[in-house]
Structures are given as C-alpha cells and as structure tokens.
C-alpha cells in the first residue's frame, strides 16, 4: 500500500510544507491540493485512472448545471442513473465480458480480447458525486418560485469545476472512503485553513493507531487465519472458528486502521473526515452494528436507497422489504459474485428478524449479562456473514461449512484451546478500550515537546522491529 512507501512519505512531506507556506492564500492552497490529488492518483495508480476521474468530473459538472437549470426531476434522476450505470459497467464488466464475447462469436463476429481495469476509487467518488447532485437538486427545489435565472446563477450548492475536481479526487478518501457528503466537504474547502498545533497530538495518535492496526494486528492475524481459510479440511472445528473469527478481527483492524491514517492525513491539511467506526464489535444487535460499522456507507444506504424506496412510511412489512432490498444492493456493490449478495441479504434478513422480534415485544432484556450475551450473538452472526464476504466463490464458503461439520469430532489441541480462551478474554475486555485513543492524546499532552520526538522514535522502532515482512493492500481498496 503506497501510504507506507518511502516515496509517498517524501512526496507528502514536500507537499505539506508547500501547502502550509500558502496559508492565507486559499485559492493557491486549493489549487496545490488539486494538483497533488491527481499527482498521487497518476504516480501511484496510472494515467488511465486520472483520465477516467477527470472525464467523470466533467460529466458531473455538466450534470449539476443541467439539474440547476431545469425544474424537471427527470434530469436529476437521469444523471444519477448514468453515474450508477458507469459504476456498474466498470465494476461488473469482467462478469459479463466472456458471455458477451461468446455471443458475438456465435454470430460469426471476431472480437479482440478486451480487459477494462476498475478505476481506483471509482465506487467512492461515484457515491460522493451522487451526494453532490442531490445537494444541487435540493437547493434548486428551495429556490423554486424565484425568478427564472435564480436557479442557474444563484444555486448555492453549485461549485466551480476546480472545487468539484478537488472534492472528487480528495486523496485521503478516494481509495476506500469514508464517503464524505458534499456539504460537509465544501464547507471546509471554502474556509481559510490554519495549522493548529493543538491537533498535532491527535494526528500523531491517529497515525500510530493506524500503523499498529494495519501493520501489526491485521497482518499478524491474517498470517494466522489465512492458511486456515485456504485449506479448511486440514483443521479441526475450533481452528476453523479461530480462522473465521480472525478474519473478523483482521477486516476491522485493516479498515479502521486505514480510516485512522486518512483522518490523520486530512487533519494535517486542515480537514476533518466524518466518523466511520465506533467500536462495532460492541454492538448488541445488527442495527447497533450498522450504527458503528462503516458509518458513512450505512448512512448512505439509509439516505439514498432505503428512504427513497419508502423508508418506514409504508407499513411494517413493506419497511422490512425495503431493508432487505437496501442491504442486498449493498452486497452487490461490494462485489459481482453470489457471495456478496448473500452477505448483504443475510444482514438484511437479520435486521428484518430483529424488527419482527421488537414488534412482538420479544428480546433478551436488559442487564449486564443480557448485554454481553447480545454482544456475543451479534458478533457470531456478523462473523458468520463474513464467511461469504471473505470467499469469492460460493463453493468455498460451503466447503468451509462442510469442513466444520466433518471435523467436529477431531481432537482439539491445547494450543487452539488457549488461543480461543485468550480471544474470549480480549472480546470481554474490548469495551474497556473505548476511550483508548482519547487517553493516548491526553498522555501525549503530558510529554514535554523536547522529549516527544524521542518517545515517538522509540515507539516507531518497536513497531519496525515487530512488523512482519510485506504489508498487504487494504482490503476495502478493492471495492
């Protein structure tokens, strides 16, 4: 991952210095940010990725002005539909490519083998563009009834092409989010930004947390769980449980570690990002889980799929249908295999079940024990659903479940029993870590500035000593 490369460190350091030398010159600062966004996409991606994004930005710019210039809702809906079609084409081209080529050959047409790469960050800047188009459309509705040129010339949500390009290419969020709403971003882009020394300790903490989560925790857990998931028939039932539980931990550390890093990079430039995680494995039910996991995606699903379908205003059973549709679409967005659809549908069905129990007045009750049992049940369900997320092929997921059933009678060794017990203890103590980041920030405040480089240097040396060879890419960068 290029965030951990020496090249990125050098380039970002030079950009950081130049960026803050321009403080007070907002237009120059924003221009430099735009240049850096595209330079990163080009240098660490490809010219192809940068060109696709540039063309996409031009389309969104034209579409936003078309939306602002007319009272017809169809223009807004058509623009969003084209964004979704563009995303679907690139994301699912590989799925229908072979069938399409075979169909052409059936009719005697010779076609060259064509491969189209999924542009880096396409999903996240597509979602961001939808929030922008909707903001323009909603602002136009507010201005309805004004003079005919009001909408075109004074729509408060319309942005210049350079500003829109900065938003869609913003390097901290382009790879794997968080999905930043346009209003949230542009309010910061239009404000004069100053370096605030009080943020330094938070930035350091976020960087350290991100590095530890990704480089140490996620990578070491992956080294343990990946062989188990790759060859489930070779392991007993407890080891298989440890493998899939390990994947749950790996995915969280990997993704939340990424978010910590990009939040630090954004804060270094004077921007704050929306929260994306809030101790998700503390959740007592699936609704609580989705209020804590990938928050920017779950709120996007709520506001741009679930509520437009009808939300909770169409009666109980239609509401449950909308929940199921929304989460199934979320699964399809993650990937083009049946497994991702199953993963999304499982979460949708789980929420329907939860809502049905609540409608009947049933539940585990209150109290510490009931809360802990609810946490365990939620974590186990989420982990079971991850089984269809981590395997691309449905047969592999079924093979894992089959191996688990076949190997139940195999003897369990002391090693895996101790690991399972330790994992249970860590899970039980997990809520105690809710204020860990805040505590680290406060601790850094207590360290004299003259000693702080020595302390941080020692911490980084320890991380360097214990870090494994090779750092895998962030998992969500593939979506």
Predicted regions and their residues:
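Membrane-embedded transmembrane alpha-helical bundles that form the catalytic cores
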Residues: 1-478
């Amino acid at each position: 991952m290029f965030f951990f490369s020496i090249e990125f460190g050098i380039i970002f350091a030079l950009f950081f210095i130049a960026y803050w030398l321009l403080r007070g010159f907002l237009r120059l600062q924003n221009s430099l940010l735009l240049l850096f966004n595209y330079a990163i996409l080009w240098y660490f991606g490809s010219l192809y990725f940068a060109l696709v994004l540039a063309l996409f930005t031009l389309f969104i710019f034209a579409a936003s002005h078309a939306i602002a210039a007319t009272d017809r809702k169809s223009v807004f809906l058509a623009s969003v539909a084209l964004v979704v079609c563009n995303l679907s084409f690139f994301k699912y081209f590989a799925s229908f490519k072979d069938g399409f080529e075979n169909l052409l050959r059936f009719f005697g047409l010779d076609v060259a083998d064509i491969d189209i790469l999924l542009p880096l960050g396409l999903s996240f800047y597509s979602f961001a563009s939808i929030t922008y188009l909707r903001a323009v459309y909603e602002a136009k509705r507010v201005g309805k009834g004004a003079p005919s040129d009001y909408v075109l010339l004074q729509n408060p949500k319309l942005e210049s092409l350079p500003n829109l390009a900065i938003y869609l290419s913003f390097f901290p969020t382009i790879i794997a989010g968080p999905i930043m709403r346009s209003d949230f971003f542009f309010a910061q882009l239009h404000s004069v930004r100053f370096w605030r020394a009080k943020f330094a300790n938070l930035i350091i903490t976020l960087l350290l947390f991100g590095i530890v989560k990704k480089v140490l925790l996620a990578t070491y857990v992956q080294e343990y769980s990946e062989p188990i998931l790759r060859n489930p028939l070779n392991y007993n039932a407890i080891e298989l449980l440890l493998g899939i539980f390990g994947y749950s931990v790996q995915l969280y550390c990997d993704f939340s570690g990424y978010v910590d890093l990009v939040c630090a990079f954004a804060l270094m430039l004077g921007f704050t990002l929306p929260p994306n995680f809030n101790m998700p494995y503390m959740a007592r039910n699936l609704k609580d889980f989705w209020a804590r996991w990938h928050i920017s995606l779950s709120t996007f699903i709520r506001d741009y799929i679930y509520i437009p379908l009808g939300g909770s205003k169409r009666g109980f059973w239609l509401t449950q249908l909308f929940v199921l549709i929304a989460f199934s679409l979320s699964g399809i967005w993650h990937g083009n295999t049946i497994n991702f659809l199953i993963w999304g549908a499982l979460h949708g069905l789980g929420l329907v079940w939860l809502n049905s129990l609540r409608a009947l007045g049933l539940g585990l009750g209150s109290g510490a024990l009931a809360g802990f049992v609810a946490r365990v049940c939620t974590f186990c369900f989420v982990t079971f659903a991850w089984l269809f997320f981590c395997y691309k092929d449905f047969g592999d997921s079924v093979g894992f479940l089959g191996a688990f059933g076949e190997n139940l009678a195999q003897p369990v060794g002391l090693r895996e029993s101790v690991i399972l017990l330790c994992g249970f203890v860590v899970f039980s103590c997990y809520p105690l870590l809710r204020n860990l980041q805040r505590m680290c920030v406060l601790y850094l405040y207590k360290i004299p500035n003259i000693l702080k480089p020595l302390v941080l240097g020692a911490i980084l040396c320890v991380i360097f000593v214990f870090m494994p060879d090779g750092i895998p890419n962030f998992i969500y960068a593939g979506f």
